Amino acid sequence: MALLIEDKKQIVAEVSEIASTAFAAVVADYQGLTVEQLTTLRVEARKLGVATRVVRNTLAKRALQDTPFSILNDDLVGPTILAFSTSEDDMGAAARLFEEFAKTNKVFELKAAAFEGKLYQGADVSVIANLPNQEKALTMLASVLQAPVSKLGRLITALKEKNESEAA
């Protein structure tokens, strides 16, 4: 069914709005998936705060034109689903979602991802998928900051014990 020009403009505006506030975008080939599998993917995406959209490639190119994700234009070929990480707390959510989905659905193929103006293609998408969410990042930072303090504490305890043993 052909889309009316008004419908096309609305789709471009919607995708462009999502892209303008997103932190990362991922493009994948969904050819061969069943409706149930795509529905499962979309449900999981909503749970994670990831915006997914199946759009005609020409409309997607127009929507991404003035965004940092325009670098994905060359990968907008064939059946394409877009995912945008819109949460500041978890910028790698879209890539992580698609990567996990691809593990269980072999026909689902990751094409590319864009993050902070850089293009990641194929297997390199895992770089974004492995980004920690905000909670994990803060935990990692706390453990890094805690390590020198605990070493200092052990050193002071060892010196104290050494001085006590020498005094006795």
Swiss-Prot record:
Any one GO cellular component localisation term in the record: large ribosomal subunit
Keyword line: Ribonucleoprotein, Ribosomal protein, RNA-binding, rRNA-binding
Keyword Flavoprotein: no
GO molecular-function terms, A-Z: large ribosomal subunit rRNA binding; structural constituent of ribosome
Its job: Forms part of the ribosomal stalk, playing a central role in the interaction of the ribosome with GTP-bound translation factors.
UniProt similarity note: Belongs to the universal ribosomal protein uL10 family.
Family matches, as PANTHER family: 39S RIBOSOMAL PROTEIN L10, MITOCHONDRIAL
Name of the protein in its database record: Large ribosomal subunit protein uL10
Protein's organism: Acinetobacter baylyi (strain ATCC 33305 / BD413 / ADP1)
Lineage: Bacteria, Pseudomonadati, Pseudomonadota, Gammaproteobacteria, Moraxellales
Gene coding for it: rplJ
